[in-house]
Amino acid sequence: KDGYLVGTDGCKYGCFTRPGHFCANEECL
């Protein structure tokens, strides 16, 4: 399932398909 995780730096790390596996997609809020 797709989703996103907001880091402490305020950036969104999204597009994870499996635990610990993230695509290279970052968006700073």
Swiss-Prot record:
The record's Gene3D superfamilies line, in alphabetical order, gives: Knottin, scorpion toxin-like
Q: Which PROSITE patterns match?
A: LCN_CSAB
Which domain of life does the protein's organism represent? Eukaryota
GO molecular function: any one? toxin activity
Classification via InterPro entries:
LCN-type_CS_alpha_beta_dom, Scorpion_toxin-like_sf
Q: Which GO terms describe its cellular component?
A: extracellular region
Name of the protein in its database record? Toxin TdII-3
What organism is the protein native to? Tityus discrepans
